[in-house]
Amino acid sequence: MPDSGPLGPHSPDHRPTPATTVPDAPASKPPDVAVTPTASEFLAALHPPVPIPSPSPPSGSASAAADTPDATTVGSALQRILRGPTGPGTAALALSVRHDPPSLPGSPAPAEPAAGRAVPGLYHHPVPEPDPARVEEVSRRIKRWAEDEVQLYPEDWEGEFDGFSVGRYMVACHPDAPTVDHLMLATRLMVAENAVDDCYCEDHGGSPVGLGGRLLLAHTAIDPFHTTAEYAPPWRESLTSDAPRRAYRSAMDYFVRAATPSQADRYRHDMARLHLGYLAEAAWAQTDHVPEVWEYLAMRQFNNFRPCPTITDTVGGYELPADLHARPDMQRVIALAGNATTIVNDLYSYTKELDSPGRHLNLPVVIAERERLSERDAYLKAVEVHNELQHAFEAAAAELAKACPLPTVLRFLKGVAAWVDGNHDWHRTNTYRYSLPDFW
């Protein structure tokens, strides 16, 4: 595990020296060079169709043989695209070669596909089973960090932490991470974000009352407070006062060592969006208000997974330049990806939230209330909403790939799409946390 060095804020004019255990982060941005794959090839490479077995044609059927796609040709075209950009200046943007610890005699064998049932009718793409060696190592490191570095949870919460399966989650979402150290950047942030959600908002003592003050002070653990000499010491002391702030502070310290200043600022901005969404949901909870469906979806554009896929370049060891990230068409892609993945969470956590005390807002609940539908019909309509958002995300990504076929853009889009798919796979397979309603 990398040495985090002294935790806490950094001077605004001084960026920490990158940790020696994450040597792959580029020192400079290679020039962008247009590449040849078309947008349609790009999308096909992201999500190759899953073959559905059909009856074998009668032997000797020439017409059937002629209608069958040439698997060799299709496979070679797919591999050509997935290899990434080629040509001058694109070497650093190819999907990274992994640098994992050498296999030991007791290393796990290739994993069998995990159990779990997808929501019927949900449009999604399967992902390869995450590398078990990586999953095991990330799981080991994150537990050591949680227990030894940030004292994240009391002993009786250990089962919940293990059931979160965050190692499998992050390995599935970041298939191009060059090292386990890079994967740990995302894993610490994910765990810290969930600690804030659980402890401030939901499961472990959270409450909408006073949430704004708690979130603002926690946000200073990732976006440092700049003040006078008199008031800085009590602020620094506050950063160790509870588990969420300790986790935010430590995870962000690791992140800024590997990220560029613009990547770190992007993450801070996306976390401010997330906290704004938390506050809207809390305000509705305090007044027992059920928003209109469109209002709920607007809230979920902020209270969603956006901060997770948008660090795909940092975790991949490269950078999407700030001007390309800020393009309106890129912002639309990112927003649609976040919106679709968040409805996945609503669908898989539906029964869990119904069994929890109080009323939890999720898309099926809001649709049922506002559109006067049965629970089943509201849930099925929420599936349709997700599917429309997912298709819109993929169409927007294809349009952007065609309009701006630069290596960094294409790789970033692939990374976001991989995160969307990995996020669904984690929800589908995490039967410790999620189960489906009996609507089919």
Swiss-Prot record:
Q: Where are stretches of biased composition, namely Pro residues?
A: 48-58, 102-111
Record-annotated disulphide pairs: none
Where would one find coiled-coil regions in this protein? Answer: none
The record's listing under InterPro entries reads: Isoprenoid_synthase_dom_sf, MIB_synthase, Terpene_cyclase-like_2
Q: Which reaction does it catalyse?
A: (E)-2-methylgeranyl diphosphate + H2O = 2-methylisoborneol + diphosphate
| Protein name (database record) | 2-methylisoborneol synthase
Family note: Belongs to the terpene synthase family. 2-methylisoborneol synthase subfamily.
- What are the protein's UniProt keywords? Lyase, Magnesium, Metal-binding
Keyword hit for Magnesium: yes
- Keyword Iron-sulfur attributed: no
Q: Name one GO biological process term.
A: terpene metabolic process
Q: Where are stretches of biased composition, namely Low complexity?
A: 17-27, 59-75
What cofactors does this protein use? Mg(2+)
Task: Supply the source organism for this entry.
Answer: Streptomyces ambofaciens (strain ATCC 23877 / 3486 / DSM 40053 / JCM 4204 / NBRC 12836 / NRRL B-2516)
Q: Name one GO molecular function term.
A: terpene synthase activity
Annotated Mg(2+) binding sites: 197-198, 202, 345, 349, 353
Q: Where is this region: Disordered?
A: 1-116
Query: What is the protein's known function?
Result: Catalyzes the cyclization of 2-methylgeranyl diphosphate (2-MeGPP) to 2-methylisoborneol (2-MIB), which likely involves the intermediacy of 2-methyllinalyl diphosphate.
Q: What is its EC number?
A: 4.2.3.118
Remaining remarks: 2-MIB is a volatile organic compound that has an unusually low odor threshold. Together with geosmin, methylisoborneol is responsible for the characteristic smell of moist soil as well as unpleasant taste and odor episodes associated with public water supplies and contamination of various foodstuffs, including fish, wine, and beer.
